[in-house]
Each structure stands twice: as C-alpha cells, then as structure tokens.
C-alpha cells in the first residue's frame, strides 16, 4: 500500500462493506456490515491505541461525517445504543441503500484517515490488513 489517501481508504472501505453486506444489500444489511467492519477494525486498533482512543477517533469521525451527512445526528434512540458506532448504524439503517453506502464509505475513510494521522501510514496499513484481510486478497486493490 503506497498511499493511504482519502480516496484509497474509501475504496478499501467500500470493498469491505460490499464483502460483508453481499450483493444488492439493503440499508439494514449495509448497516450491519458497517458494524461488523468497525468491530474488526476496533478489535485490532484497541491494543495499540486503547479503547478510549478508538472511542475518541469514532467520536471525531462522527463529528466530521455530520458535516457532509447531517442526517447522522437525527433519530437517536439511546436505549438501543451499544458502543460508539451505534448512532451511525442506526442512521444508516434508515437511508436509501446508495446513500447509506456512500456515507458508510466516507465514515470509514475518515476513521482510517484519522488513524493514519495518529499512528502513521505503515502501522495503519498493517492494522487494515489484519482487520480486513479479504480486502487485500487482490494486490491490485492496494495500488489503484
């Protein structure tokens, strides 16, 4: 992986979401895929930056994503929240699948971009490969 720019991170995220959600997935399946992808990434990131670090990056990601996707702040149901990504998942479930896909890709690109800023590109690349190995099965994915 040579450059983890926003576009490259977004492509990786969209590939992971598509793999987890399956073909022609609806918004609920996409939201579940986003939750699973987040859990995978949080699992490999937490030993390095701590759960508090993961939560802080998630909070900052949500704040930044709300600029482009203001609907991410609407329709809160706190009693159902389980973890810092719950608000995003809840909101993704209520969107058109194309909109949910676009937003989820942007959310993951933002989260991983913040991770690059925080721990550097080489270490982030290693974490992404560990969290989402299927996204890197095709070497051309890394270089395009």
Which role fits each region the language model picked out?
Residues 1-144:
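Long, compositionally biased intrinsically disordered regulatory segments in eukaryotic proteins
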